[in-house]
């Protein structure tokens, strides 16, 4: 079995990207099969519980106050409405319910409602994940006490390209929040977005950042940029060859993430609705084992449940069931991890 390493060098990761595609795919599939049931994919649902009005200037985001995207700011959703949505997601087959709020960071006054939401969703038997922006250690502890399973805070891209995408929050801010989450005992969900005009070397840096954390994220979402008119990147990349990342390069990124982070759930996230069935199949072969279901991801379109069901039937895939045994196995394997240098 491939050992779990956190001491990957950038040169090693670059060499993985440079491999012949079929060899890379074979290597990723081999690693995937060693740690995960290859025919099972986790189904997740994402709900925006507070949309728009974010003071950050993330160039990809339609919810930024800097974007002229037409997204209207809303208040935090009522607790019961969130729980109703969670119940609907469970009925549709989701095992994981993710909730996002367009904040730079949650205010202390928002935390009681957030805690109530987490407890309510957990009581339904769903795995819970939240993305609320930067967290203080105290807020992370509150979420842990409420029973939150995962906290998402993406690094977005490699450290060298980051400042071309965001100026209101630095790279270390993101890493600090991930550490606060880890210190609180919450599972880490962290990934990024490809196709923002970055180079392959930037994608190497993105994977390297995550693969050399003291402990790999338990969940790694890989997004393909959905260029939204009125956002900095949406307008900058419109009608250019960079407006959509090459499908093979996207699959390469998924494969390299799988090889370097064998235990992580690698999630196909935004951008999947524009991918062909063949591209999605290659991603699953390369080690992606989690998707978002439903018609919408925050403010972006997503492949609907019916399309996903048809694709799963065509590929012989099934929804992941009983993740707890997998988590125990991952904990055991994680004890043998090679430490970061």
Curated annotation (Swiss-Prot):
Binding residues annotated for [2Fe-2S] cluster, in chain numbering: 98, 129, 189, 267
UniProt xrefs under SMART domains: BATS, Elp3
Catalytic activities: (4R,5S)-dethiobiotin + (sulfur carrier)-SH + 2 reduced [2Fe-2S]-[ferredoxin] + 2 S-adenosyl-L-methionine = (sulfur carrier)-H + biotin + 2 5'-deoxyadenosine + 2 L-methionine + 2 oxidized [2Fe-2S]-[ferredoxin]
Cofactor: [4Fe-4S] cluster; [2Fe-2S] cluster
Keyword S-adenosyl-L-methionine found: yes
CDD domains in alphabetical order: Radical_SAM
Oligomeric and partner information: Homodimer.
Protein name: Biotin synthase
């Amino acid at each position: 079995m491939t050992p779990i390493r956190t001491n990957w060098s950038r040169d090693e990761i670059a060499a993985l990207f440079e491999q012949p595609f079929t060899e890379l795919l074979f290597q990723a599939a081999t690693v995937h099969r060693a740690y995960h049931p290859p025919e099972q994919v986790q189904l997740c649902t994402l709900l925006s519980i507070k949309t728009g009005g974010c003071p950050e200037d993330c160039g990809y985001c339609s919810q930024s106050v800097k974007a002229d995207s037409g997204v209207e700011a809303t208040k935090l959703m009522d607790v019961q409405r969130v729980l109703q949505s969670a119940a609907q997601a469970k009925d549709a087959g989701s095992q994981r319910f993710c909730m996002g709020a367009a904040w730079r960071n949650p205010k202390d006054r928002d935390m009681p409602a957030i805690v109530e939401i987490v407890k309510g969703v957990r009581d339904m038997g769903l795995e819970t994940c939240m993305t609320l922006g930067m967290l203080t250690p105290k807020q992370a502890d509150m979420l842990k006490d409420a029973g939150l399973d995962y906290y998402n805070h993406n690094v977005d891209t490699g450290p060298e390209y980051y400042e071309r995408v965001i100026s209101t929050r630095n790279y270390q801010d993101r890493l600090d929040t991930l550490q606060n989450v880890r210190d609180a005992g919450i599972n880490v969900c962290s990934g990024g977005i490809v196709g923002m005009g970055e180079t392959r070397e930037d994608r190497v840096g993105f994977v390297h950042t995550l693969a050399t954390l003291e402990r790999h994220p338990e969940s790694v979402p890989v997004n393909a940029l959905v260029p939204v008119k009125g956002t900095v990147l949406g307008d900058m990349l419109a009608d250019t060859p960079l407006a959509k990342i090459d499908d093979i390069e996207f699959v390469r990124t998924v494969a390299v993430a799988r090889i370097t982070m064998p235990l992580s759930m690698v999630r196909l996230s935004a951008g999947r609705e524009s991918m062909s069935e063949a591209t999605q199949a290659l991603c699953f072969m390369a080690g992606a084992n989690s998707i978002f279901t439903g018609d919408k991801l925050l403010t972006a379109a997503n492949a609907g449940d019916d399309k996903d069901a048809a694709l799963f039937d065509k590929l012989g895939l099934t929804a992941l069931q009983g993740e707890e045994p997998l988590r125990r196995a991952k904990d055991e394997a994680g004890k043998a991890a090679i430490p970061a240098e």
